[in-house]
Amino acid sequence: MATPVRDETRNVIDDNISARIQSKVKTNDTVRQTPSSLRKVSIKDEQVKQYQRNLNRFKTILNGLKAEEEKLSETDDIQMLAEKLLKLGETIDKVENRIVDLVEKIQLLETNENNNILHEHIDATGTYYLFDTLTSTNKRFYPKDCVFDYRTNNVENIPILLNNFKKFIKKYQFDDVFENDIIEIDPRENEILCKIIKEGLGESLDIMNTNTTDIFRIIDGLKNKYRSLHGRDVRIRAWEKVLVDTTCRNSALLMNKLQKLVLMEKWIFSKCCQDCPNLKDYLQEAIMGTLHESLRNSVKQRLYNIPHNVGINHEEFLINTVIETVIDLSPIADDQIENSCMYCKSVFHCSINCKKKPNRELRPDSTNFSKTYYLQGAQRQQQLKSSAKEQKSWNKTQKKSNKVYNSKKLVIIDTGSGVNITNDKTLLHNYEDSNRSTRFFGIGKNSSVSVKGYGYIKIKNGHNNTDNKCLLTYYVPEEESTIISCYDLAKKTKMVLSRKYTRLGNKIIKIKTKIVNGVIHVKMNELIERPSDDSKINAIKPTSSPGFKLNKRSITLEDAHKRMGHTGIQQIENSIKHNHYEESLDLIKEPNEFWCQTCKISKATKRNHYTGSMNNHSTDHEPGSSWCMDIFGPVSSSNADTKRYMLIMVDNNTRYCMTSTHFNKNAETILAQIRKNIQYVETQFDRKVREINSDRGTEFTNDQIEEYFISKGIHHILTSTQDHAANGRAERYIRTIVTDATTLLRQSNLRVKFWEYAVTSATNIRNCLEHKSTGKLPLKAISRQPVTVRLMSFLPFGEKGIIWNHNHKKLKPSGLPSIILCKDPNSYGYKFFIPSKNKIVTSDNYTIPNYTMDGRVRNTQNIYKSHQFSSHNDNEEDQIETVTNLCEALENYEDDNKPITRLEDLFTEEELSQIDSNAKYPSPSNNLEGDLDYVFSDVEESGDYDVESELSTTNTSISTDKNKILSNKDFNSELASTEISISEIDKKGLINTSHIDEDKYDEKVHRIPSIIQEKLVGSKNTIKINDENRISDRIRSKNIGSILNTGLSRCVDITDESITNKDESMHNAKPELIQEQFNKTNHETSFPKEGSIGTKCKIPKYRQ
């Protein structure tokens, strides 16, 4: 018996073989069902029998192997069966090859029996047709690969259709049916060509019988249809409609127009112009007739100088030459703009009576050349005589008008030449004779002139002629007048001709022109400045008296240095060496280097910082190992809760920047932020900080920071005193970040207290922009792991947006208008400012409208200053002043020793003693940043809806569940949730609970600046200060904090993670000591009533 493993192996191999057999049988069946096998083709019986015999033999071998496999015993090895199965696979491959050969033989029989019928065939490439040409047999035509992609429904495009069809025939090696020598082609080829050209014709184009199957008749029918609609007069008008000048700078449109005219003549030339010259000369005259007189000479000169390209037709070469000439001459006319004509609505002035055609009388031959070619016999002779009379009369009128001008006082402006020549030597400045036998040639080879010399002609280019330009000009006595190149004139002086060639000039000067015999002239005295007689000045060389001569004298370098007032040694040596003094001096140098102690002391300077020295230093360190840091501030602001300082750290290698804003710059704050930044770099970027550069500020040179750097093994490099350039990278980045933040605040019309969010946004953007020194993104360069950055993930700072309100009520809008600030580093969302609630929240459910609107209507209304939150001092001047203060802080941020008002200036000695006694007790609001005094109440909860009950129900969330442990952040959030204001609530009426959604109350609570609040909140005794106006006056006089008012003046950032513990002693103290200290303060304290600072409050216990 066979084992389970052997049975499984046998079944798998058997199934694979059966699948291959069935797939091959299906393939053979599909081959039999192809269109070629369904044709009436006789197949020999022997070939069919051979196919069946091979198939039966294969099945017999397969059945024999299966029977032999079943007879194998359990001890037999299965290797023998695998070898036999391998041989069976080889047999299957042989049978497949024979099947393919048989199919090819059947197809060959079909083609031999039906040579005159077009059949479809299929191979690995696709469907194809077989046909014979005059030069080859059995050519294959694949319709998918050989596509004729031109379609037309217009009779006007028949020449283009025939031209593309001729290129298609030549490309795919069909017989050229357009040749007169070819009369008959293969019927299969004829059927293919008829099918292709009929696909190119539109359905609405009725030019012939649709049942026509002869390609020659189809082509003749297309030509006859086109000739019947385009007679001699039609073609003459088509040529006369086109006028090409230097304003036709659209090369694609110009080439399309001229090629269409050329094709029109090529397909009907042999039938209509039998007595005319050959097609080549006729088309050349026709194309030259479309050119303006100012352009024709330049084209002729280019055709004469440039050899003809053998690879293209003569007409294509001529059209390309015209286009190149127009392109070369068009930049000269800077004041000309290519527009459609206002009369004929065309770029080429295609109307015969167009008023904008410049100088129509200048093209007498171009308007009549087609008529003279087409007219025959007496009519042609009569037309020639009439045109000659018109030419003579036109010449007479020109001669009469030319008598007024004197050729010696005129200058010719040549638009087709690049060389300036003159016959008047007196016009040339700095003239020099030419020793070489230089000769210039015109259009003809026999019209050469010799050059005798060269100089410069000064062109008047201003009212006072103070900015004259010089043109290199050759002196040719044989020339009749002075010729100035229009191209050279425009290049040097930017003087160009107007559209109608009536003026020559630029923005400063304009000169009238006169066209004489088709040549542009200007007056010489208006264009050229003649050289004056006293232009050369001979300088008088000073000489000493012949009777007096000074003897040579020796002098030491030290003596000369003292005599010349302690000036530079090198200047003294050069002055004596070059004999600038009358006496002859011999300078004696000391063997040792000269040293002047007086100069060294008096002229001492700072050390020079060479350009790129810091870059060379940064390349020696790996990314993230070397940093430079500095502090910016203080930022002047009337708001006490505005952060005033910014710490910046920049990587010297990758230019990655890290910024943070703070209320102060003491050692504890700066050290905590540096420690946080270093830990972030080591954890997120997998980099090791080894070196930090900073200045000698007290915030960087204290013992705490030095101890931390020593513990981390970081090398702290300090700059020299007052050597700010040594820390120039941090200084430069401070300027970059602050100017970016100032720009964002200015364009968004936000207050200066939002500058910390603008700094965060600017820092994130700078880290994701390529730096010009490294050529990389700083974020990608510093990270050891690959980082992906998306541009669309950045939102525009200060723009309007809509965020989802998760606290919205039913039948109320679920969106809140907000202002985009910056990315939240502690979440995947963005920070938004909600003006209606005066809050800053983080959300990733937002919608941004189209902010790419017109800048003139953006930010026309300051929505951030609503009537609810604005004070009487808020206006546009205050906004400008806040941004100005930030800019002034940038300029003067190095001056950190600004006078700070002390508490002694605000309070009396009795009040200060009370503040000092309260300072020893820890305050639960030490972790709070701002100028709000958070109020608590211990009023019992009642059922009446009055003010007292509302206060008690609101504060129950603080006193409930005393067994829970609250962190500093949770405690602060509870304190923030208890902020109340009762200025707008009617105490006599009921309070609707729907107005308490945001945990805000309306109560007249007076605000205390944060400087005083840190000492007051959590105090044991109440400071009894009844004169509120006196405190306000004292604060105003010292410019500290903001004016005490009764309105809400603070924006609470409920997502700000920067609320840190300001009292580290409180943070590090034991829970038992903290509880003991709070138990001492756990009793009611009487604050002044409404109208004075504070209110009745009770400090809750610290929960363990």
Swiss-Prot record:
Molecular function GO terms recorded: aspartic-type endopeptidase activity; ATP binding; DNA binding; DNA-directed DNA polymerase activity; RNA binding; RNA-directed DNA polymerase activity; RNA-DNA hybrid ribonuclease activity; zinc ion binding
Gene3D superfamilies: Ribonuclease H-like superfamily/Ribonuclease H (3.30.420.10)
Disulfide bond positions: none
All residue ranges annotated as the Integrase catalytic domain in the record: 619-786
Catalytic activity: DNA(n) + a 2'-deoxyribonucleoside 5'-triphosphate = DNA(n+1) + diphosphate; Endonucleolytic cleavage to 5'-phosphomonoester
GO biological process: DNA integration; DNA recombination; proteolysis; transposition
Compartments, as annotated in UniProt: Cytoplasm; Nucleus
Keyword Magnesium: yes
Keyword flag Hydrolase: yes
Top-level taxon in the UniProt lineage: Eukaryota
Binding of Mg(2+), residues: 630, 695
Post-translational modification: Proteolytically processed into capsid protein (CA), Ty4 protease (PR), integrase (IN) and reverse transcriptase/ribonuclease H (RT) proteins. Initially, virus-like particles (VLPs) are composed of the structural unprocessed proteins Gag and Gag-Pol, and also contain the host initiator methionine tRNA (tRNA(i)-Met) which serves as a primer for minus-strand DNA synthesis, and a dimer of genomic Ty RNA. Processing of the polyproteins occurs within the particle and proceeds by an ordered pathway, called maturation.
Active site: 414 (for protease activity)
An example Gene Ontology CC term for this record: cytoplasm
Record keywords: Aspartyl protease, ATP-binding, Coiled coil, Cytoplasm, DNA integration, DNA recombination, DNA-binding, DNA-directed DNA polymerase, Endonuclease, Hydrolase, Magnesium, Metal-binding, Nuclease, Nucleotide-binding, Nucleotidyltransferase, Nucleus, Protease, RNA-binding, RNA-directed DNA polymerase, Transferase, Transposable element, Transposition, Viral release from host cell, Virion maturation, Zinc, Zinc-finger
Region (Ty4 protease): 381-501
Coiled-coil regions, chain positions: 48-112
InterPro entries membership: Integrase_cat-core (IPR001584), PolX-like_BBD (IPR054722), Retrotran_Ty1/copia-like (IPR039537), RNaseH-like_sf (IPR012337), RNaseH_sf (IPR036397)
PROSITE patterns: INTEGRASE
Region ranges (Integrase-type zinc finger-like): 539-599
Self-association state and partner proteins as the record states: The protease is a homodimer, whose active site consists of two apposed aspartic acid residues.
Role summary: Capsid protein (CA) is the structural component of the virus-like particle (VLP), forming the shell that encapsulates the retrotransposons dimeric RNA genome.
Something else known: Retrotransposons are mobile genetic entities that are able to replicate via an RNA intermediate and a reverse transcription step. In contrast to retroviruses, retrotransposons are non-infectious, lack an envelope and remain intracellular. Ty4 retrotransposons belong to the copia elements (pseudoviridae).
UniProt comment concerning the protein's domains: Integrase core domain contains the D-x(n)-D-x(35)-E motif, named for the phylogenetically conserved glutamic acid and aspartic acid residues and the invariant 35 amino acid spacing between the second and third acidic residues. Each acidic residue of the D,D(35)E motif is independently essential for the 3'-processing and strand transfer activities of purified integrase protein.
Protein name (database record): Transposon Ty4-P Gag-Pol polyprotein
Top-level taxonomy: Eukaryota, Fungi, Dikarya, Ascomycota, Saccharomycotina
